[in-house]
From Swiss-Prot:
Species assigned in the record: Glycine max (Soybean)
GO CC entries: nucleus
This protein's name: NAC domain-containing protein 6
Region ranges (Disordered): 178-204
Broad class of the protein's primary localization: nucleus
Gene3D superfamilies per UniProt: NAC domain
Residue ranges, compositional bias (Low complexity): 189-201
Tissue: Widely expressed.
DNA-binding residues: 115-167
GO MF: DNA binding
Function of the protein: Involved in response to abiotic stresses and promotes cell death and hypersensitive-like responses. May act downstream of NRP-A and NRP-B in the endoplasmic reticulum (ER) stress and osmotic stress response that mediates cell death.
Description of what induces expression: Induced by abscisic acid (ABA) and cycloheximide. Induced by tunicamycin, azetidine-2-carboxylate (AZC) and osmotic stress.
UniProt xrefs under PANTHER family: NAC DOMAIN-CONTAINING PROTEIN (PTHR31744:SF79), PROTEIN CUP-SHAPED COTYLEDON 2-RELATED (PTHR31744)
Presence of the UniProt keyword Transcription regulation in the record: yes
């Protein structure tokens, strides 16, 4: 049993500035996982025991004992019923999907000695088989199949895959293209004052009565708005033509007279309709007097 002094020393070493936990794959399998399976308690408890499938990956960093960019957990292997013993890797908001086949891990001192297997999984948001791929990655380490030790516990390493600048630019371009397609596919509807829409007789027959009454009311209001506008334009054109004709005339009235005298015409009677009497009754013959004749000669 660890004493209080050992626990204080352990806590002090872990929290020392510059301390990092970056074990190799051989150390994870041959030391940490194997000792956990056989029940040997380690002096420094740096890897906690947690069922990570009860949490989403973005919540796991806060549940790990140590780690800044990589987080480690001992995880129980939960079997999924009715699927051939395949482990259940489903969370509340997504699922972990395996990529590729398992990779064998060997020791550096003896490359022929297999100490474990590594499975790589990627987290998808949504429900299988569909889902949105994320940048959360998990390496699941387990003991080899020929190992006589229990295999109900695995060691998982959680981290986020670094995204290159090229991939980020491609994502931004795709997002911009998608937004442009949405803008082109759904143009803004014109206002009611700019565009008038009238229903055909066939459409009016197929409309429900409340909807038809609403459409007819809107059309009537639109016509009431258009007619005064047309009358206003006509009055403006007439006024403009009147001003133009008034300003453009060259006729000047004599000084002291505001209007021209009326044109004097002879009065017509019934007997003036005769051609002969009309000639004798002309204004020139009426003024033909003896005095005028003497003046003429």
């Amino acid at each position: 049993m660890a004493t209080m002094e050992d626990m204080n020393n352990m806590s002090g070493e872990i929290t020392l500035p510059g301390f990092r936990f970056h074990p190799t794959e051989e150390e994870l399998l041959d030391f940490y996982l194997k000792n956990m399976v056989v029940g040997k308690k380690l002096r420094y408890d740096v890897i906690g025991f947690l069922n990570i499938y009860q949490h989403d990956p973005w919540d796991l960093p806060g549940l790990a004992k140590v780690g800044e960019r990589e987080w480690y957990f001992f995880v129980p292997r939960d079997k999924k019923h009715g699927s051939g013993g395949r482990p259940n890797r489903t969370t509340e908001k997504g699922f972990w999907k395996a990529t590729g086949s398992d990779r064998k891990i060997v020791t550096l001192s003896d490359p022929k000695r297999i100490i474990g297997l590594r499975k790589t999984l990627v987290f998808y948001q949504g429900r299988a088989p569909r889902g949105c791929k994320t940048d959360w990655v998990m390496n699941e380490y387990r003991l080899p199949d020929n190992c006589k030790l229990p295999k109900e516990i695995v060691l998982c390493k959680i981290y986020r895959k670094a995204t290159s600048l090229k991939v980020l630019e491609q994502r931004a371009a795709l997002e911009e293209e998608r937004e442009m397609k949405q803008m082109v596919g759904s143009p803004a509807s014109p206002s009611s004052t700019d565009t008038m829409s009238f229903s055909s007789p066939q459409e009016e027959q197929n409309m429900p009565l409340p909807l038809l009454q609403h459409v007819l009311k809107k059309e009537s209001e639109t016509e009431d708005m258009v007619v005064p506008k047309q009358e206003k334009i006509t009055n403006q054109l007439v006024l403009k033509d009147t001003n133009k004709s008034t300003c453009g005339t060259s006729l000047q009235m004599p000084f002291g007279k505001e209007k021209l005298p009326d044109l004097q015409l002879p009065m017509l009677s019934d007997w003036t309709q005769d051609t002969f009497w009309a000639q004798l009754n002309s204004p020139w013959l009426q003024n033909f007097t003896p005095t005028n004749i003497l003046n003429f000669y």
